[in-house]
């Protein structure tokens, strides 16, 4: 049988090729392509399959991407040619997707809400993170897990989990905790999409108040849209704007976390792992500003939003391929309890605020 060379191109090969002028640059580009293509293609294929299933069967796209990705975990084994590309998709592609989320938000949308909803969103996010931090520490799961889950529940679900995980210090449990958070937040968000409109009706909330409640509590954007427009068009519009305001809280939260861990690294005498404000958050703010100017045509904005969604689903698929079911089963009941408690805490806090404002 003929031997097939499966050697993965290395960074040393790339740097060596770059020394030989234009021809070397072309050769280096080819080596990079060979290095990343198998894993990126596998991740995009998982994303495409997840999108197809979601469009035809209605379940959350990210949940499908995770489950399909985990079925192909063998592609991320140490000797696999796809490993480097999968790592690229789970990090760089992820950051691109988060940065492009800024094209969903305008400053005008935030201004149109008035002061009270903005203050409510700010304190609900802050208090949910602090609650998660305290509860996680009390239950022996550590501060990082509390920040990760609290931020995910308080801000924007799976997207926030990925963005926050990107700036937290990494350890042997980081990827497992991120995947667990994404799976749990997707399940809780789906349940909230079904249950929270009924809760709004029970409390007799009008269309605007119901929109504030749904947008301020449901975890992922897609489920907010689904729940809001199932009540009324006004409720859907209000819920979407409130939700996007929560998405914008990614910027200060990620900046503060980066600042905290930057100072901690300096105190410990270690070189800082990241800049104070990661580039993908800088671009997030930049895209919010560009979108606020109204200079980007709507078809282009929609295209960018689609690219963002594809990047995030691709990254989730890659993370799934790097995660084993065994490691998830080892998490235990405490993390599940923490995330349920955070979800209930946020719902009660926002509902109380909405009733008070009404």
Curated annotation (Swiss-Prot):
Keyword flag Cell membrane: yes
KW Zinc (keyword) present: no
Bilayer topology annotation: Multi-pass membrane protein
Intracellular or extracellular location(s): Cell membrane
Key words, A-Z: Cell membrane, Membrane, Transmembrane, Transmembrane helix
InterPro entries tied to this protein: UPF0324_pro
Residues that span the membrane, as ranges: 36-53, 57-76, 83-105, 115-134, 146-168, 178-200, 244-261, 276-295, 307-325, 335-357
Chief place of localization: membrane
A Pfam family per the record: Cons_hypoth698
GO cellular component terms, semicolon-separated: plasma membrane
Family label: Belongs to the UPF0324 family.
Annotated protein name in UniProt: UPF0324 membrane protein CT0845
Organism name: Chlorobaculum tepidum (strain ATCC 49652 / DSM 12025 / NBRC 103806 / TLS)
